[in-house]
Amino acid sequence: MFPALETHLKQTIPDPYEDFMYRHLQYYGYFKAQRGSLPNSATHQHVRKNNPQYLLHGSLGGKDDLIPDTLQKEKLLWPTSLSSAVHRQIEAINRDSHMLSLPHLRSRQLLYDELDEVNPRLREPQELFSILSTKRPLLAPRWPIECEVIKESIHHIEWAPPQPEYFYQPKGNEKVPEIVGEKKGTVVYQLDSVPTEGSYFTSSRVGGKQGIIKELAVTLQGPEDNTLLFESRFECGNLQKAVRVDTYEYELTLRTDLYTNRHTQWFYFRVQNTRKDATYRFTIVNLLKPKSLYTVGMKPLLYSQMDANTRNIGWRREGNEIKYCKNNMDDGQQPFYCLTWTIQFPYDQDTCFFAHFYPYTYTDLQCYLLSVANNPIQSQFCKLQTLCRSLAGNTVYLLTITNPSQTPQEAAAKKAVVLSARVHPGESNGSWVMKGFLDFILSNSPDAQLLRDIFVFKVLPMLNPDGVIVGNYRCSLAGRDLNRHYKTILKESFPCIWYTRNMIKRLLEEREVLLYCDFHGHSRKNNTFLYGCNNNNRKYWLHERVFPLMLSKNAPDRFSFHSCNFKVQKCKEGTGRVVMWRMGILNSYTMESTFGGSTLGSKRDTHFTIEDLKSLGYHVCDTLLDFCDPDQTKFTQCLAELKELLRQEIHKKFHELGQDVDLEESWSDISLSDIESSTSGSDSSLSDGLPVHLANIADELTQKKMFKKKKKKSLQTRKQRNEQYQKKNLMWKLKLTEDTSEFASTLQKHPAFFKNSESSSFLPMRNENPRLNETNLNRRDKDTSLDPSMTTLILPKNKGRMQTNLNRRDKDTSLDPSMTTLILPKNKGRMQVLHLIYCI
């Protein structure tokens, strides 16, 4: 009568709808159950309600993932959080993961509070677009199938150093390392299979490469063995090889961006089995940039697990004898540069990490967004959606932040602000600035509430999750720099960029976009600054510089207005900043935050900390309020200051050129691009163009075309044919005998040898008329004579056609069947000439 209430009723015939939804959701990674079984949706919702923060660990998207595997089980994993205690729970759950095995219910609409009690209620409707909520699980990161990934959970605490971390001051006696490599050293760590140039991304899965994870580090021979144990097969990790060249000295090789042979800048790896009293030297041997902030005092980052556990100390700047220079390696293609430093570890048998900058992983982002989605207050004005899926199938998140409007007219009047980060995966600076912005805009601060009242914020916190996960520095899994492809039409190859541009295009149709800003990191300049676009409209002249100037006043010890640049270069046409500007967003910027630190004010010669970067996110919000203040006093003052700064810059430029000019009348008509220098160029132009899989096909087609061109003879012009004919004619004359008069008399003495000689004429021999009707020599040879020692031989008709190829000019001609005349030498010496005459 009431089958839905029979909790232990076995379902022998699968429900078609349930079966369809199971297969559909399994494709997106929500279920990994045993073959032939169906998920208990009521049970899943019960678990999610009581334990909202869990990860569904499994693989999806690959061919093998579409078919349920009897050996695969559904694992419930707690996500990374800010508490180290929670992370210890993660590892325990990983070890003792279990599978939901409860009887399936017929009804899909009734739920139960307890498994043993009958208290049915209707299921709540699921949200269509929200991904992270108490009702939906997080998806684990997906890796290319070539990448091995360790199962350990890596987590770091946030920490602000109590004292400023000053730049390293070079002493001038820093050691220049001599790279010896594997010949004189011992390889102690090396990745087996690294996708490089020539290969391309094909598929992905959770956990990366299938099979048993190999132990790449060396095996210690005993407790006295002091060899360091290296590891980098985790999120954002990057280290390809480590070579031990001395007891405490190691040469390190970074992995290039996947499917490329370039972009070695970001590093992040783990070392174990440390010794406290020893001085270690590390040398990265394959860096590609000739300039670096390491030359002006930047230090690497060190993280000690023992310090984090016992003293609550996180990442800190460490290192001595730091030197960045060109190394002695030469592969014949491009020069390499090396970074070397020495360090003393704080503990014996410690687990430590080195990094180029403060890491911020895809899992860190997901945990932050999960906390927002589960916050009952923040979730009211922050809606989380999926913009798209990356090439590997990872979610690209889109946040819409605004307070609910009272009327439709009020909602339509709101202007929009678009912010994005991590299009370059190795620039984790952008994620920390973005986190500072989100912390403030989602807070209950009166300024934050006001901003939510007047703006609609569209936030893309991580545009390139694939690159972040695998530890790339600049490229996506397409092997290309996404910040050069904002004009792309290749949606399948660059989905993150294509959908971002499309979203902004639709947004512009709905409302005005006041500001677009993409958060980046810079490896060759200190401080923070903006790149913008000069406005050619005289009505809004210099308006694009007001926001950067205001930001420099709000953060005077971190932001440098004089480092800003507004020149639009041709090589930057594909960047987000320029494309959005051409789409109509006047205030379109790229914010560059240094990997180093500040040279300004109270923070002069100190490294940026995580808190410094997060404060920049707050200052973006503060500057937005100043920029949009109905009282235009600040705006007007900044505009006047900009005009004065520009006047001084123009005077300086003309003074450098040795010219004097009166700028009282027409100085505002001078093009701003003419007085601005170009931005310090990046090496992204090398990663522009087609995605690598299409580039490989294009290269193959080009090679085939070139081969065909070489094989096929090109047609000659008339002029070339005439020149070739004259040259051959001259060579022919030189081979003939010198006595032309005797040849003429020979022809007169033997007229019978030539049939119809009276009516014969000398016709030129052409390819289109190989059969000649004349008995005389070809017109090309009419001025030549045969040697008198020659004799003529008339061959009878029944001998058949004579096939000869002695004369290449006549190789395509056929002999007349009636008569063939050969002129042969009398003596047995070398033949001087052999000529065929065809008769009618």
Curated annotation (Swiss-Prot):
The active site is at residue 592. Keywords: Carboxypeptidase, Cell projection, Cytoplasm, Cytoskeleton, Hydrolase, Metal-binding, Metalloprotease, Protease, Zinc. It catalyses: (L-glutamyl)(n+1)-gamma-L-glutamyl-L-glutamyl-[protein] + H2O = (L-glutamyl)(n)-gamma-L-glutamyl-L-glutamyl-[protein] + L-glutamate. Its cofactor is Zn(2+). Metallocarboxypeptidase that mediates deglutamylation of tubulin and non-tubulin target proteins. Catalyzes the removal of polyglutamate side chains present on the gamma-carboxyl group of glutamate residues within the C-terminal tail of tubulin protein. Specifically cleaves tubulin long-side-chains, while it is not able to remove the branching point glutamate. Also catalyzes the removal of polyglutamate residues from the carboxy-terminus of non-tubulin proteins such as MYLK. The gene is AGBL2. Inhibited by RARRES1. GO terms for cellular component: centriole; ciliary basal body; cytosol. This is Cytosolic carboxypeptidase 2.
